[in-house]
Design a protein with these regions (language model features):
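Conserved N-terminal phosphate-binding loop of PLP-dependent enzymes in the Aspartate aminotransferase
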Residues: 1-401
Length: 401
């Protein structure tokens, strides 16, 4: 089926909740996606940070296929080997005690909120249930995680929202301290605000938040849905901050392309979550976990060193491009701000026409390439971006540059 028919059918029958790019994708290999007519795209989006190993990694695909031919689903009424293997690997890699598996980042964050409130209820009783999150945060699109999201643009139309969430500005530790009262149970944050513009938090602020949580016995939840599993050059972004959260959430890159969410809990937050406290029919699915096991196994020291090296190469190249004002993020989670009237959406469209797929986040261009990229892949992407930005620079008024 050609692209036009694929797009037409989708527009006719799929709910229009996405502002899709006007292209269809049919298959992929490595860092390249291919359309029905054979047009190729160098993909620096990874399906929004999901395809950690690129498209159709052979070892990953074989593991998923092999498990699908053995046992595709059981529910959590029974034990399966892939689920337990993955949980053990995650605990050993992160120092956490237990893992709960769901199907998405939003579901993982819901589970984290529940676990934090359960800990507080068990130790302090009813009424200590407020979670503090950051302005410009993004934690999901369910009602609870949408309420946790500190961006008013996401709060239109869907009220009434859940009680129990308040917001503070990143970096303002005194403002945060003033918000904490006898009703507060947790502080929840992203170390890099992905949908908020790819903005990394200040390390001193993060350590001050940890200290405040220790002082007040608050649960510190770190949302690593987008930053986790090698994206920043370490298995968790927490490692860059020398941070030990009480709960960490993972999703996107963990499954390598299949839907998964994970709540990683330390001993104190795990102990109260007994049978019936939470659940997910599809959580810990053996096929998905088989793929995730391959992803986690791949994240050895050599692999992560290459991620860091490619990030240095990419950022150094981006800094030399015309119209680039500054860069944000950590590792291979990159935000690009432009001078003057250059719009990230226009850069995205122009890159797509030249065969490079990229993302936006607020006013910035966002790059989330597969973690398997090579030096050649980086240079090719930089070449396309250079072409696009040079053309835009020539058209822009001189004072904008």
């Amino acid at each position: 089926m050609d692209s036009e028919k694929v797009i037409k059918r989708d527009n006719e029958y799929v709910l229009h909740t996405y502002n899709r790019n006007p292209i269809a994708l049919a298959k992929g290999h490595g860092l390249y996606a291919e359309g029905p007519e054979g047009q190729k795209y160098l993909d620096f989006t990874s399906g929004i940070g999901v395809n950690s190993l690129g498209y159709c990694d052979l070892t990953w695909a074989e593991a998923v296929s092999e498990q699908a031919h053995k046992l595709q689903h059981t529910s959590n009424l029974y034990y399966t080997a892939p689920c337990g293997k993955l949980a053990k690997k995650l605990c050993k890699r992160t120092g956490m005690s237990k893992v709960f598996f769901g199907n998405s980042g939003a579901e993982a964050n819901e589970g984290a909120i529940k676990a934090a409130r359960k800990y507080s209820f068990d130790h302090y009783g009813k009424g200590r249930d407020v979670v503090i999150t950051l302005v410009n945060s993004f934690h999901g699109r369910t009602i609870a995680t949408l309420t946790a999201t500190g961006q008013e643009v996401f709060h239109n139309y869907f009220g009434p929202f859940n009680e129990g969430f308040v917001y503070t500005t990143a970096g303002d530790i005194e403002g945060l301290r003033e918000l904490v009262d006898r009703h507060t149970c947790a502080i929840m944050l992203e170390l890099i605000q992905g949908e908020g513009g790819v903005m990394a938090l200040d390390p001193e602020y993060v350590q001050a938040v940890r200290a405040l949580c220790d002082e007040k016995d608050l649960v510190l939840i770190v949302d690593e849905v987008q930053t986790g599993v090698g994206r920043t050059g370490t298995f968790l972004c927490c490692e860059h901050y020398n941070l030990k959260p009480d709960i960490v959430t993972l999703a996107k890159g963990l499954g390598g392309g299949l839907p998964i969410g994970a709540v990683l809990l330390n001993e104190k937050t795990a102990e109260g979550m007994g049978p019936g406290s939470h659940g997910s029919t599809f959580g810990g699915n053996p096929v998905v976990c088989a793929g995730a096991n391959v992803v986690v196994d791949r994240m050895d020291q050599s692999f992560l060193a290459n991620v860091s090296e490619r990030a240095v190469q990419l950022r150094a190249g981006l800094a030399k491009l015309p119209m680039v004002k500054n860069l944000s993020g950590i590792g291979l989670m990159v935000g690009i701000e432009f001078f003057g009237g250059i719009q990230a959406a226009d850069v995205l469209a122009a890159c797509r026409e030249k065969g490079l797929l990229v993302l936006t986040a607020k006013s910035r261009l966002r790059l989330l390439p597969p973690l398997t990229l090579t030096a050649h892949d980086v240079e090719k992407a930089l070449g396309i971006l250079n072409e696009v930005l040079t053309e835009m620079e020539q058209k822009a008024p001189k004072e904008q540059a």
